[in-house]
């Protein structure tokens, strides 16, 4: 299993006075079981690159292959890709939106077509993984501490059981 970027370029506001080349000729392969760190200065393209990994942003040029399939190919199932490549944002607490923690963590699995019971089972397991017990299930995610919000948001991605976690 791998996620491969081949000569990926990305330009913000192409053809305008505000054109910015955020990514230039990026070649990268992420293989199963690898842990990869991405470092760089503010504005160096780290977040832009990460957004390409599950198709949130489309490369201006180049290809991205998941399990050997071009994600920009006609008819590619981007919904499936996004459930297989889980993305935790730089400020994951901004991902929270439901009325309680358990509902928030269930959102992804429910969008994958799971029943309420199946989604809750995955959500409970993910919340346990990040150290949030039953006492948090019915709390508003907005009443949690900053660290608890981050853990709840990460649990929301883990509950979808992605093959790759970014």
Label every PLM stretch briefly.
Residues 39-41:
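The feature captures the beta-strand-to-loop junction immediately N-terminal to the Walker
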Residues 117-135:
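Conserved ABC ATPase "signature" region
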Residues 54:
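Helix-to-loop junction immediately C-terminal to a conserved catalytic motif
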Residues 62-73, 81:
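Conserved ABC transporter NBD signature motif
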Residues 161:
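Conserved catalytic motifs of ABC-family nucleotide-binding domains
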Residues 1-2, 11-25, 74-77:
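A short, flexible loop at the N-terminus of ABC-type nucleotide-binding domains that lies
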Residues 140-144, 148:
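Conserved ABC ATPase signature
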